[in-house]
Amino acid sequence: MASLKVFSFALLIVLTFSVIGMIYNVESGGSLCCNSHPKFGKCNTNNDEQRCNRWCHNGCGNGKGGYYKSMSHGGQCHYYC
């Protein structure tokens, strides 16, 4: 009976940390999809847009790729949703 209580408690702890981790990822912008990524660098040419699309295609699980998004401080690579 004691081992069942220990197992239940351990499972509860694991599930709690899993949920906290998922919430932290969503709030911190951990997802690559649907976000702009300045670390890719500025996009200026058609070649950069193709490179951005390939980079996003490999980095996001939805397989949709990305595009060059014009912004006030220069273009950035943005993942499709």
UniProtKB/Swiss-Prot annotation:
Q: Which UniProt keywords apply?
A: Antimicrobial, Disulfide bond, Fungicide, Plant defense, Secreted, Signal
Gene Ontology cellular component list: extracellular region
> What highest taxon heads this organism's lineage?
Eukaryota
InterPro entries assigned to the protein according to its UniProt record, in alphabetical order: Defensin-like_20-28
Q: Which GO terms describe its biological process?
A: defense response to fungus; killing of cells of another organism
User: Is Signal set as a keyword in this record?
Assistant: yes
Question: What subcellular locations does the record give?
Answer: Secreted
Location, primary (coarse class):
secreted
Q: Which stretch is the leader sequence?
A: 1-21
The Swiss-Prot or TrEMBL record describes its family as follows: Belongs to the DEFL family.
Protein name as catalogued: Putative defensin-like protein 26
- Organism of origin is Arabidopsis thaliana
